[in-house]
Amino acid sequence: MRERIAAGQKCYEEKRSAEKNSEGEHRIKEVDAFKGFLIFAVVFGHFLLPLKDSPYSFFGRSFYLIYSFHMPAFLFLSGYFRQKSKRKKGAKLRSLLSYLLLYLFMKVFLHLSDILFYGEQDLFPDFWHESSTPWFMLVLFFLELTLTPLDFLQEKNTKLFKQDSKRDDFLFLYLFFLMILFIPLSFSPIGHKVKDFLALDRFLSFGPFFYLGMISGESHFSFQKIPKLPCFLGGIFAISLFLFLPHVYPYTRVFYGTWGYRIEREAILPFFKAYAVLLRIGFIPFSLCIACFFYHLIVLFLKRGSGKLSSSLSSFLVKMGKYTMPIYVFHRPFRDAFFASGAGGFVLLGRGNMAQALLFYFCLLFLSALLLFLLARDSLNLFCRFRFWGK
């Protein structure tokens, strides 16, 4: 019996080792590092959220810079790797169930946080409306649903999908159709009534980034050969946004992925009030160019960084890029507890001096990195991916 158990354990370990080696072969170090940077930006951005209106403007400027690209970049990558992955039988159902269950779990988990730290009185969370952190899971769920026709045709192995050229053309036309459908729908008058019902505003606003990622995954796009022009433009956009935020602040509403009517009622130019859909369209290349700029910086850092500190930081980012899901799911209550303790009150009210505010800013950077380190665990990763259901 002991020999059988030992043999079974050895077989399991060999299988896990083979899975990790296979996974490592298909990973791109630069992309993992960029994902690590993005999830750090998510956590740091949530720490900055309560302080975005602080008299110390660098809190707000940093917050809006992060929000200008971090979720569009994540959705682009989600679409890209969804298209690149080899989908096994039953993968779609597992994905849908995982996203849905993670959404329900996050709603309950964060509702408990709201009760503990914000004095929430309702005993049960509102599962039908979402504008906070869990929206990402719900959006991924709906995006996966929109791909059902593609998956159905592929599983049936129709004539359309037997020829690569026809399959690629159909894929592009279908995804492009969804993109041009979502943008005007996000300005539909129905938004006044449904508001954040099932995060439909985020679904329509951020969906095009996911579909663009899928199109890129099917094209000749390569992370190793990103043109320099979008990186250069992204640098200009990022620096301009940070420096001139007070002048463009009314236009930042588009960063949140809200319904179009909320963009139209901001103090924007009359032309954009009449044609606010142009802001939604323009936000797509704007945010992706900024993402390209930071990706280029990460790549330069990985290639030219030297010394132990640089090596440690590179390894940290690459590792964090492999644990984005558990970090995203579990990080927010730590932020809630931190501010519920009264930390940061002097920054929000402007009671400290500039040196104290800067020190607190770097403290938030450190806490964000520490939180990533604490949540980057295999056990949490397996829980979020529901691996116990099988591959």
Which sequence ranges carry the predicted segments?
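Alpha-helical transmembrane segments and their immediate juxtamembrane cytosolic regions
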Residues: 2-391
